[in-house]
């Protein structure tokens, strides 16, 4: 237990150099900012830390944060248009070694289910749902991609502030985050008011991993199964402020199936002020 505690704090302060997906990581300080996987690694670093937190006994299911000016609001801008950013989803197979393999077929299944459920939930709340592909072709695609990458980095910072507030003391007692005014590029042509960003990572134990989970204790080896982690944020496109944020951590739920994907979205959208 103490060893895991030390690993958690070392990882928070030093960062990861390489990630192998959910369940596998090389805990070494990240120095090469030019490495092609560096930005990806930084954005997913905290997701790996959440697994460590779970192992430390943190019973986390969802963690909702709302900006002060909307706290307590049950319906914020009802009927407003929301740009649904394509869900950033990756599903992995967890090997006996603890390494993971990205599964494109599983990922596509999950993305389809999650996208459909998100659209239905937003529509049920009276929101007009837009996607980037439906926006004007005159929009700068490269600029929009930069906004998506900026959000990934911001989400990572929010998670760090929530899980280790001593690292960002100015954010300890207030939820005040922004993507900046550049995010307004997502508003045209219909002047959408909000954007919803969703990031999900999930892993599933392979047959070999399941066997190790059963036989491992007899050999003095501990092995865990997969972990589902999701992050969702609602951003005000008029000023770039993050007005709602939710973190989901679960040990169960197969996103490859429509019904369990529906349950995951219900949890992920908990407290959404729309």
Label the model's feature ranges.
Residues 3, 14-15, 21-24:
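Residue-identity detector for glycine
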Residues 13, 18, 42-45:
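Basic polycationic patches enriched in arginine
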Residues 18-19, 54:
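Repetitive helical segments and hydrophobic/amphipathic motifs
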Residues 34-59:
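Sec-dependent bacterial lipoprotein signal peptides
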Residues 97-201, 244-247:
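N-terminal segment of the mature soluble domain
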């Amino acid at each position: 237990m103490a060893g895991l505690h030390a690993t958690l704090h070392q990882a928070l302060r030093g960062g990861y150099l390489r990630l192998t997906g959910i369940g596998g990581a090389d805990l070494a300080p990240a120095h090469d900012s030019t490495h092609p996987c560096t930005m990806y690694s930084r954005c997913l670093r905290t997701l790996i830390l959440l697994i460590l937190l779970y192992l430390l006994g943190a019973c986390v299911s969802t963690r909702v944060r709302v900006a002060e000016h909307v706290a307590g609001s049950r319906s914020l801008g009802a009927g407003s248009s929301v740009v649904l950013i394509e869900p950033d989803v990756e599903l992995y197979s967890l090997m006996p070694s603890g390494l993971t393999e990205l599964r494109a077929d599983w990922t596509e299944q999950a993305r389809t289910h999650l996208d459909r459920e998100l659209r239905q939930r937003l529509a049920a709340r009276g929101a007009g749902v837009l996607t980037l592909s439906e926006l004007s072709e005159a929009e700068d695609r490269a600029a929009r991609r930069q906004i998506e990458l900026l959000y990934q980095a911001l989400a990572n910072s929010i998670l760090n502030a929530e899980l280790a507030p001593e690292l960002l003391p100015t954010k300890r007692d207030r939820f005040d985050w922004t993507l900046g005014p550049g995010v307004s590029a997502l508003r045209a042509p219909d002047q959408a008011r909000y954007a919803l960003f969703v990031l999900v990572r999930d892993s599933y134990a392979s047959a070999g991993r399941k066997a190790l989970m059963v036989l491992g204790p007899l050999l003095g080896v501990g092995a865990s199964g997969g972990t589902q982690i999701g992050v969702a944020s609602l951003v005000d496109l008029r000023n770039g402020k993050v007005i709602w944020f939710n973190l989901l951590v679960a040990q169960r739920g197969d996103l490859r199936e429509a019904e369990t994907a529906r349950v995951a979205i219900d949890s992920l959208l908990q407290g959404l002020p729309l």
